[in-house]
Amino acid sequence: MTDTELRVSKIQKGTVIDHIAGGQALNVLAILGIDGTSGDEISVGMNVPSDRLGRKDIVKVEGRELSQNEVDVLSLIAPAATINIVRDFEVIEKHRVTRPETVEGVLSCPNANCITTENEPVDSRFEVLEAGVRCSYCGTIIRESLAAHISVA
């Protein structure tokens, strides 16, 4: 393979999520609700060489542009990610993710006594910290395994 040869082919229309930390691509797919059963065309590169990250993952989703809510959640596990919107095989929009101040309804609180885990009509809300998130209701902080608490459908 030459330096100019693509490892994964270009997509005609959709979203490319680049500069994902190595090993996180499967979590990205889970966040997007992609499990291979719907027939979506997906290309995944894992642990490919990267000048910026050393090793990175990349996900290409044909025929789908991400919502801002999806991008906000992705930023929690892939803060260095770049989102590329592709149309007619050309990148028409490119931006780095930015972490929101809060996320609502996308994470589950691990505290069994939190009001969001009971049979109450309360969506979870977390404040985004430098190294994790804090439940706005009970104060529980999640620093590790954040992807395990994501509940986006």
Curated annotation (Swiss-Prot):
Cofactor: Zn(2+)
Binding-site positions, Zn(2+): C109, C114, C135, C138
Keywords: Metal-binding, Pyrimidine biosynthesis, Zinc
Disulfide bridges in this chain: none
One Gene Ontology cellular component: aspartate carbamoyltransferase complex
Any GO BP: 'de novo' pyrimidine nucleobase biosynthetic process
Note accompanying the cofactor annotation: Binds 1 zinc ion per subunit.
Origin superkingdom: Archaea
Molecular-function GO terms, alphabetical: metal ion binding
Task performed by this protein: Involved in allosteric regulation of aspartate carbamoyltransferase.
NCBIfam families: ATCase_reg (TIGR00240)
Protein family according to the UniProt entry: Belongs to the PyrI family.
UniProt subunit comment: Contains catalytic and regulatory chains.
Name this polypeptide is given: Aspartate carbamoyltransferase regulatory chain
Organism name: Natronomonas pharaonis (strain ATCC 35678 / DSM 2160 / CIP 103997 / JCM 8858 / NBRC 14720 / NCIMB 2260 / Gabara) (Halobacterium pharaonis)
Gene (name only): pyrI
